[in-house]
Amino acid sequence: IVSDNGASAEGMEGSVAELNAQNGIPTTVAEHIAVAEQLGGLDAIGGPKMDNMYHSAWAWAGDSPFRYTKLVAADWGGTRTPMVISWPNRIKPDKTPRSQFTHVNDVVPTIYDLLDITPPKVVDGHKQDPLDGVSFVSTFDAADAPEVKETQYFDIMGSRGIYHKGWMASTFGPRTPWVAAVPDLSDWDPM
């Protein structure tokens, strides 16, 4: 699996301290430059002294050709990532990408299928929930194999999406990752 999910847009306009961006603390380019110079110049960026976060526009670019970014359960920019499977003794070399929809929760059922393992119903006296995923072994030998995953639900911080038989429906939640989520003090209710 090439990445955890889409590129991250929480950096808003960019920051030398990711927690500033995540907590909606605005900073300026001049402040970024001053901090970088104080910590060793441009060579400090990306090193152990900084926890920098790129501009949200770079996240959109990084998720191309899909729209949106990490923390948005919509339109693949925040949810779709490539996976490469290699098993020279079982899978014949084939340069054709597979476009069948799969999800990370399909990996274990696929491994169980390959190893002919039936998932246990009870482990150490504890009843086990059934696995959510399905095996995608059929795609190993046939680039045009029919999809086996029919439905997958996505939800992150109120942003929701559902994939069903080739269709995707989605909606934004209460927070947009590239906008500072700082409520007005009158909106705070400590009780």
Where are these regions (language model features)?
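Metal-dependent active-site segment of extracytoplasmic phospho-/sulfohydrolases and closely related
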Residues: 1-13, 40-44, 60, 77, ...
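Surface-exposed acidic, glycine/proline-enriched linker/cap segments
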Residues: 24-65
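Short beta-strand motif preference
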Residues: 83-85, 162
